[in-house]
């Protein structure tokens, strides 16, 4: 099946790997890992709507995450064998959704800090607003109309990268964030307001590993704990740093992804 998204390809043999990027980035996030593993796997990394070489979503701020998910499923459906899913943050969220939708097509998952806000809210038995207000008292991230404003972007960047990060960014560093601000805001709203309860992820029977940092936001580390407690047989690996480790500290992150793939090739992974 075809997809309107740009899909980056590396390698041509072995078990396919579909790698899903974080908000604000593109499929090229996975280039170094893909080049390292392309002798053993065919690797496909799409640019989601609004990023890289892919078109914008026709729905603007009314974007739904299912638009990206449908394209991921189309990519998976076009493969002639089961694939391994890799993901970071929003990409990890989509990977979990794809594995639930196509269990027969997904062999294993290795994800860096996938975000499951609905699962966190259901586990804590509270409205999502109660979760968000801890770090965003004005609930700016739930207001898509603020997309692209300095107050929204500062709240978003500082949450994921640490207090003061937005102020320290140069104009050149801010430019791609500002360019993708509408899609980022639409994604954030979609993911944060997703109501999928945590127990749904117990349906995943594939080998699952969750990678995480040491200084990531508390909510994200709680999500990791919830997933590993919910998904039978899942494992974790800890890497010094925070949520943006795949960009800021890629060598150990990619080493963990590569090790997971090697263990799969060696038959060392079991559900």
Question: What are the roles of these predicted feature ranges?
Answer:
Residues 173-229:
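Conserved serine/cysteine hydrolase catalytic core
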Residues 29-31, 54-60, 120-123, 221-222:
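Conserved catalytic-core motifs of eukaryotic protein kinase domains, centered on the activation segment
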Residues 144-185:
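Conserved alpha/beta-hydrolase catalytic His-Asp/Glu region
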Residues 35, 44-86, 90, 255:
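Active-site loop/oxyanion-hole signature of alpha/beta-hydrolase fold enzymes
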Residues 20-22, 89, 213:
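Glycine-rich His-Gly loop
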